[in-house]
Amino acid sequence: MKKTFVLLLALGMSLPLLASCERRIKIEQLPQPAREFISNYFNDTEISRIEREKDHGRNEYTVRFKDRAKIEFDENGRWKSIENHSTPIPADALPQRIREYVNNHHTGANVREIERDDRGFEVKLTNGTELQFDLAYNFIKYD
């Protein structure tokens, strides 16, 4: 009886782990907007792997490149985060107003990482500066 209880307890505790599992996929399995984004801004960068993660019933995608760049997409193919610690993120991949703010206020710095959530954007520059923008791309503050 004790063994059965322990087994059921272990099984019950492992279910959340099963709900969030990663699986390798091919580029053709990405949502169309994600494929277009990669084609437009990272076409010259070789992909090392693509993963789909099911998290709370929603698909999320992570694309890793051989130059150590990484892009995370939501279930609709909209980017959630872009990062590259070996080379700057292509300027054209960034929202125009964020790109202009960085160019005007941080001459010589490039964007190394950008994250989008339901409140706005967090941007990390190559000079170590961290910036926050709202959803309308207005600068809010330095982090």
Go through the PLM ranges and name each one.
Residues 22-143:
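Interaction-mediating elements
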Residues 1-26, 38:
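Bacterial Sec-dependent N-terminal signal peptides
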